């Protein structure tokens, strides 16, 4: 009997492959860094071949290290950085342009024009999204316009579009399957989340030929099998979800009202709203949390573009630390009398502001400000932004009021300083799970659910285990003062935009 699920986690800065046991623990892991390219201000790209080669290499390495073969693998589950856009040749699988990464802002002017022309209401009603360069539609349009002959080839059916999951699936299956799942489709700004189908009006608006698009399937579904030459025998691919939705599944947030927040390069908080999509009045987005057996579960989502990236800035930009973990120690040494605020709008502000043109700033600097105060400001910025998201969720969903237990995951959740400060500023408990690889676990669970490797969601949820609960320790008046200082800083920046 197969003993593992092979989970592929293709992220913004690295690709990983992990073997997951039936009890949800990790048996083996392989990881490779993924280069990014910044051809101009606000532009972020990756080579499609780097994405593919790192994923394939990690899969082969993890199988070799564990001494297992295809017969030991029940299924493959894929999770991926969302919105990142690729267009490739169907005949060869070769991309016609570098992947345009979700952080890329080059289409901000196009988005502003569409908003000014009054298209925002239609897009919001059909997709649950706000018009923003973050999503895939304007990235696709840019590639079709920039690459000579691309539009004509797309209309002839010679090209294929996909987010990273779809591209990997195409390559893994030897070009036999061009498909995606409902969560990734819901991030394109082309997908009607109510009907569960590509929307002809939006395809016309963005100039995207239908022939370019992948088939949309459930998150737990039959996605084909790997080409036998890759691993020596075919391995079925049975699960797929965007990284944040996969983390929600891995956190067992299956009940309406449950909230998780993932801290990686960015920060993404999702609130399960059940089988009814909730239209946000506070500039959150409505998205598909997961789709199983044809039934869609929806979520309200707030997206923050800079979380762990702020720590990377301390390390790589300011050269203040050598390793990300040092930021905790440094922040703990900060002078509490200095109220330094960092608004890390390096690539604009995400939810609930959605201001792509705003840039970052520091407030409250004095002659005494040093590395410790800057480190604390970087970590607190993540907490402040999370508070903005949770407040918006409270206001949007009638079932969400009062203190919320927040389940956290992602690399930055390992920071005790940040998680404690998050609980302090939220005025609510923050729960860190024993298994922090929740994104991988979610992808593995979806694949395992499809083939009976894992139990139904209600039983799976009983296995969720707490590692530590952070409880608020900040006085109410101090919390209110700190949040007011943050919001004043944000308003100052927005007023200059």
Swiss-Prot record:
Protein name per Swiss-Prot or TrEMBL: Glycerol kinase
Residues noted as binding ADP in the record, renumbered to the chain: 12, 16, 265, 308, 411
CDD domains per the UniProt record, alphabetical: FGGY_EcGK_like
Taxonomic source organism: Xanthobacter autotrophicus (strain ATCC BAA-1158 / Py2)
Pathway: Polyol metabolism; glycerol degradation via glycerol kinase pathway; sn-glycerol 3-phosphate from glycerol: step 1/1
Functional description taken from the UniProt entry: Key enzyme in the regulation of glycerol uptake and metabolism. Catalyzes the phosphorylation of glycerol to yield sn-glycerol 3-phosphate.
One Pfam family cited in the UniProt record for this chain: FGGY_C
Lineage top rank: taxon: Bacteria
GO molecular function, one term: glycerol kinase activity
Family: Belongs to the FGGY kinase family.
């Amino acid at each position: 009997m197969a003993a593992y699920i092979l989970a592929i986690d293709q992220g913004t800065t690295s690709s990983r492959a992990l073997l997951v046991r039936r009890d949800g623990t990790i048996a083996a892991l392989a990881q490779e860094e993924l280069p990014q390219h910044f051809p101009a201000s606000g532009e972020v790209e990756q080579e499609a071949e780097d994405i593919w080669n790192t994923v394939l290499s990690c899969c082969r390495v993890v199988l070799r290290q564990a001494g297992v073969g295809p017969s030991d693998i029940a299924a493959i589950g894929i999770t991926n950085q969302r919105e990142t856009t690729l267009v490739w040749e169907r005949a060869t699988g070769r991309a016609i342009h570098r992947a345009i990464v979700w952080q890329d802002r080059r289409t901000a002017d196009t988005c502003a024009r569409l908003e000014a022309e009054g298209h925002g209401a239609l897009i919001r009603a059909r997709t649950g999204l706000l018009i923003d360069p973050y999503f895939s539609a304007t990235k696709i349009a840019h590639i079709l316009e920039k690459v000579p002959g691309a539009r004509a080839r797309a209309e002839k059916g010679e090209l294929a579009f996909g987010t990273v999951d779809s591209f990997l699936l195409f390559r893994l299956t030897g070009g036999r399957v061009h498909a995606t799942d409902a969560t990734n489709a819901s991030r394109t700004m082309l997908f009607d989340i109510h009907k569960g189908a590509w929307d002809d009006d939006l395809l016309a608006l963005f100039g995207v030929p239908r022939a370019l698009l992948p088939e949309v399937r459930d998150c737990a579904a039959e996605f084909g099998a790997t080409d036998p030459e890759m691993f020596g025998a075919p391995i079925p691919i049975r699960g797929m979800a965007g990284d944040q939705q996969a983390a929600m599944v891995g956190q067992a947030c299956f009940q309406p009202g449950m909230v998780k927040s993932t801290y990686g390069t960015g920060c993404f908080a999702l609130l399960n709203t059940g089988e009814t999509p909730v239209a946000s009045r506070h500039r959150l987005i409505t998205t598909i949390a997961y789709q199983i057996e044809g039934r869609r579960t929806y979520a309200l989502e707030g997206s923050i573009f800079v979380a762990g990236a702020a720590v990377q800035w301390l390390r790589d930009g300011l050269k203040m630390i050598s390793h990300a973990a040092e930021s905790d120690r440094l922040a703990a040494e900060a002078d509490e009398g200095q109220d330094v605020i960092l608004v890390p709008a390096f690539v604009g502000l995400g939810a609930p502001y959605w201001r792509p043109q705003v840039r970052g700033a520091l407030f409250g600097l004095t002659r005494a400000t040093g590395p410790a105060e800057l480190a604390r400001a970087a970590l607190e910025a993540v907490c402040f932004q999370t508070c903005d998201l949770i407040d918006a969720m409270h206001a949007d969903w009638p079932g969400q009021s009062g203190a919320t237990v927040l389940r956290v995951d992602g690399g930055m959740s390992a920071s005790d300083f940040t998680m404690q400060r998050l609980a302090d500023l939220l005025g609510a408990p923050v729960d860190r799970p024993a298994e922090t690889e929740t994104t991988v676990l979610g992808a593995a669970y979806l694949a395992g659910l499809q083939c009976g490797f894992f139990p139904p969601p209600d039983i799976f949820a009983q296995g969720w285990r707490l590692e530590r609960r952070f409880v608020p320790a900040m006085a109410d008046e101090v919390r209110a003062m700190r949040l007011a200082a943050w919001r004043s800083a944000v308003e100052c920046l927005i007023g200059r935009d």
